[in-house]
Structures are given as structure tokens and as C-alpha cells.
Amino acid sequence: MGPREVLNKLKWGGGENLRKAKITILHRGAPGDKRVIEGTDILELGRGFMRVLSPEEEVYIPYHRILRIEASGLVVWKKSD
């Protein structure tokens, strides 16, 4: 199961699991080249990307940049090395 499927499962699985999720992405230039996105900042789960509200603007992040997905403090998906 890839990151898109995991995020959709969190979104449609009931409750507010996607809103409580933390998604770590590859973000060149950020400390450690990583950035954490809160589930509450996800505006849309598209076919090849997620649309996210960032402090500056809305941005499109391709799923292949996702490194890890956490839900309720547990890692539910991690990119293989």
C-alpha cells in the first residue's frame, strides 16, 4: 500500500484520523531536508499529489516525496530505504 492509499484510508475510515495525522516529506532546504505537514493542512488528495496549505500559499506535493505518515502517534507508513 502506498502513501496515497494510506492517506485515503485515514480520510475515509471514519473519525478525524487524517486531521490528526503528521506527514513527513522531503523538503530540500529545510532543516534535515524534511518538513512535517499536519493533517489539518491537507486540502485535497489528488491522483498524483496532495494539495496543502502552507504558511506562504497552497502547494502541490507529489506523493513520492512523502517519507513517513503517523496517525495517533503511530507510524502507519514509511518509505522503504
What would you call each of these model-derived segments?
Residues 1-57:
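N-terminal recruitment modules of adaptor/scaffold proteins
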Residues 53-81:
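Short, compact, well-ordered microdomains
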